[in-house]
Amino acid sequence: MDKIYVGTIVSTHGIKGEIRIISKLEQSLKEKVFKVDNSILINDKEYKLKSYRRHKNYDMVLLDDFNNINDVLFLMKQKVYIDSKYIELSAKEDFELNYKEYEVITSDKQKGVVKALEETGNNYKIIRVVVNNKEELVPYNEHFLKKIDSSKKQVEIELL
């Protein structure tokens, strides 16, 4: 089973057992993950989603068979995952989740590795790559990120 990290349960909300999850996933991916009747994994146990909504920066989730705040208190501060069989990832989404597994190929055919994918604010991201033992920062946009091949786990980039 291949698990994808979704976020962390930070607190409860209300008395009906709703839990707050803080997650760094893109909204398009959250829409795939938090579908009603999907199952999420907490401590390697599956829980079925009864409802989902956004509230401020949180993902608010009700789980089946939990109708009271006291029933969900044991889940506090736990990490939430989803089995990858429940969602179909695009190449871009796969890269954002599994960037450390990707090999970098530059436009002049040099090879390297992705060290990090960092947010710099205002929804802007930078890819930190290492090519020939030299660290480079590459803007995460279509001008520099030429091709993502999720089957080969390769990303083709343009360096300046």
What kind of region is each of these model predictions?
Residues M1-L160:
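Short Lys/Arg-rich amphipathic alpha-helical segments
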